[in-house]
Curated annotation (Swiss-Prot):
One of its GO terms (molecular function) is identical protein binding. This is Protein CASC3. A motif (Nuclear localization signal 2) lies at residues 254-262. Residues 137-283 are annotated as: Necessary for RNA-binding, interaction with MAGOH and localization in nucleus speckles. It comes from Bos taurus. Phosphorylated. ADP-ribosylated by tankyrase TNKS and TNKS2. Poly-ADP-ribosylated protein is recognized by RNF146, followed by ubiquitination.
Length: 703
């Protein structure tokens, strides 16, 4: 538009200047354009005839100068027929293109003159020449003139307008080079292939030449039937280093299999590991008859060196180990063979962790390691020794192992006030009872040194009974609990052991009696209810239901009172803490435990859901252990666990380095307990409950 305006302005100046010269020379009709412009510029002073002549001149000028590019003058002259030029012109011009230049021309001559003077002066001569020229030249000139009609070009032939306008200027929507172009034929989208079948067919013809070669391009990935045929074992071994197809051949896949158990995955791989585990258990344990107990022992002895650490880990990781130990104990009982192997693997795995945990509870750890490794080492012997110990001890050990698994499930399940009472010692045995384990009764004293020594002093006949049980249970419960608890903490070990070792557990449980009846295979919780109606089953329930930690707590309580098995969990999980509360709580809780037998079962229900109950139970166990150590009454003492609730705080807080109570050495798992607390695991679910969004909402509301 700016170009058009400039062109128009230049034409106007040319016309007007030529018109002015014409008026000066006499305003001849030939120069009517000049006279017209002069009259208009003068405010209509020119005569009518002169105006008409000016009109004719204007028409001629329009043709000469370019029909489309009429000057403002011409338009004025045209519109003037006897009407005052200014008024008509101003209206006409405003209707024209609303071009400021034309409007100014129509309104005042001064503005016109100014604009014209601004235009090229050279146009004067050209304008004069053009006037003299004929119409034919108009077309040539018109090409450079306005291309869009504004209503003033009606006199010009439409042909010229269209002919010149079309080729000259394309609307934005018609110009293919313009982004605003609107396609009106064919496809509307450049890549729309719906109607381009022909083009597509044509294109390939042009593409016949290949710029690259495909030969050998897929050699690395070609399908070769000969390669798809099954490979021979030799080929597989050559390729992979072992027969990848023998899923059930442990020798071929030994490394992998071993790794998995270490990580506590054996439960899932029990079927494949069943063969291997028994072998390992045999390696560690010896007679197959004692395999189930030994299996547990293996857990204890599996990582003999590590085992001490595992036990410590149980104690150090009291709660975690409690859970792990709890179910694994059951699993251990059930898994005699399988679980044993798994336990071994997991034992080594946990022993690693436990080795770490020793740092957590150095003094307990040292004791635990000292006691634990011997116990582990001797747990295997002890299982064989149960026969030497006495016929009952052998079953007792299995029973106690079961009892321990019970202890995991139901600490009280030890079934067994006596067992539980002696069981208190087993945890230390877990720490260092193993050596005594080889000897049924003597091991008991040895264990007693750790756990049962007081028991011996406290309970003469019971202690021997429990001592045997302790030996058995200590072997399986202390060491195994640590692993089992650890495993259960990990979650996989418990289930694995439970899945793998349910039958063995039943063996132990059978030995234990009612305990054997419980399905220790799956959730310890299931077996909690099943656990013997007596407090011990409740204990198991508490321990199992609550956390594995509660089991540990309960285990310790029962350990003191009921049997060594429960205590190992305590020792593993809460032993240190228990030790502190135990000595302190013993006196205080001794009376309470008896009144609280009923309470003990309630804690069971509570403990499953709450870590605090575990602590309460654990304290109860502490006090109960003291009482239990004195005698079988530990059952009531186990209930006494409820009164010990405060002790939980005491024992965690007290964190006595290690105390020997009733012949039971209590280590300070308070530190370990804090670390292994299963609360964190539960907290993991809690975060779901505690959802961060609510805090966000609160912050939003506050903000």
């Amino acid at each position: 538009m700016a170009d058009r305006r400039r062109q128009r302005a230049s034409q106007d100046t040319e016309d007007e200047e030529s018109g002015a010269s014409g008026s000066d020379s006499g305003g001849s009709p030939a120069r009517g354009g000049g006279s017209c412009s002069g009259s208009v510029g003068g405010g209509g002073s020119g005569s009518l005839p002169s105006q008409r002549g000016g009109r004719a001149g204007a028409l001629h000028l329009r043709r000469v100068e370019s029909g489309g590019a009429k000057s403002a003058e011409e338009s004025e002259c045209e519109s003037e027929d006897g009407i005052e030029g200014d008024a008509v012109l101003s209206d006409y011009e405003s209707a024209e293109d609303s071009e400021g230049d034309d409007g100014e021309y129509s309104e005042e001559e001064n503005s016109k003159v100014e604009l014209k003077s601004e235009a090229n002066d050279a146009a004067n001569s050209s304008a004069k020449d053009e006037k003299g020229e004929e119409k034919p030249d108009t077309k040539g000139t018109v090409t450079g003139e306005r291309q869009s009609g504004d209503g003033q070009e009606s006199t010009e032939p439409v042909e010229n307008k269209v002919g010149k306008k079309g080729p000259k200027h394309l609307d934005d929507d018609e110009d293919r080079k313009n982004p605003a172009y609107i396609p009106r034929k064919g496809l509307f989208f450049e890549h729309d292939l719906r109607g381009q079948t022909q083009e597509e067919e044509v294109r390939p013809k042009g593409r016949q030449r290949k710029l690259w070669k495909d030969e050998g391009r897929w050699e690395h990935d070609k399908f070769r039937e000969d390669e798809q045929a099954p490979k021979s074992r030799q080929e597989l071994i050559a390729l992979y280093g072992y027969d990848i197809r023998s899923a059930h051949n442990p020798d071929d896949i030994k490394p992998r299999r071993i790794r998995k158990p270490r990580f506590g995955s054996p439960p899932q791989r029990d079927p494949s590991w069943i063969g291997e585990r028994p072998n390992k258990s045999h390696r560690h344990q010896g007679p197959g008859g004692t395999l189930p107990p030994r299996t547990f022992i293996n857990r204890n002895a599996a990582g003999t060196g590590r085992m001490s650490a595992p036990r410590n880990y149980s104690r150090s990781g009291g709660f975690k180990e409690g859970r792990t130990g709890f179910r694994p104990a059951e699993a251990g009982g059930q898994h005699a063979g399988r679980s044993g192997e798994t336990v071994k693997h997991e034992t080594s795995y946990r022993s690693r962790h436990l080795e770490q945990t020793p740092v957590r509870d150095p003094s307990p750890e040292a004791d635990a390691q000292v006691l634990g490794s011997p116990e582990k080492e001797e747990v295997a012997p002890e299982i064989p020794n149960p026969a030497p110990d006495t016929a009952p001890p052998v079953p007792d050990r299995p029973v106690e192992k079961k009892s321990y698994s019970r202890a995991r499930r139901t600490r009280i399940k030890a079934g067994d006030a006596g067992k539980v009472a002696e069981e208190v010692p087993p945890p230390p045995e877990g720490l260092t009872p193993a050596p005594p384990v080889p000897e049924a009764t003597p091991p008991t004293p040895a264990k007693t040194g750790n756990w049962e020594a007081p028991v011996d002093s406290t309970t003469g006949g019971l202690e021997q009974d429990v001592a045997q049980l302790n030996i058995t249970e200590q072997n399986w419960s202390p060491g195994q609990p640590a692993f089992l608890q650890s495993r259960e903490l990990r979650g996989m070990p418990n289930h694995i052991h439970m899945g793998a070792g349910p039958p063995p557990q039943f063996n132990r449980m059978e030995e234990m009696g009612v305990q054997g009846g419980r399905a220790k295979r799956y959730s310890s919780q299931r077996q909690r209810p099943v656990p013997e109606p007596p407090a011990p089953p409740v204990h198991i329930s508490i321990m199992e239901g609550h956390y594995y930690d509660p089991l540990q707590f309960q285990g310790p309580i029962y350990t003191h009172g009921d049997s060594p098995a429960p205590l190992p969990p305590q020792g593993m999980i809460v032993q240190p803490e228990m030790h502190l509360p135990h000595p302190g709580l013993h006196p205080h809780q001794t009376p309470a435990p008896l009144p609280n037998p009923g309470l003990y079962p309630p804690p069971v229900s509570m403990s499953p859901g709450q870590p605090p109950p575990q602590q309460l139970l654990a304290p109860t166990y502490f006090s109960a252990p003291g009482v239990m150590n004195f005698g079988n009454p530990s059952y009531p003492y186990a209930p006494g666990a409820l009164p010990p609730p405060p002790p939980p705080h005491l024992y965690p807080n007290t964190q006595a380095p290690s105390q020997v109570y009733g012949g039971v050495t209590y280590y300070n798992p308070a530190q370990q307990q804090v670390q292994p607390k299963p609360s964190p695991p539960r907290r993991t679910p809690q975060p779901v409950t505690i959802k961060p969004p609510p805090p966000e909402v609160v912050s939003r509301g506050s903000s």
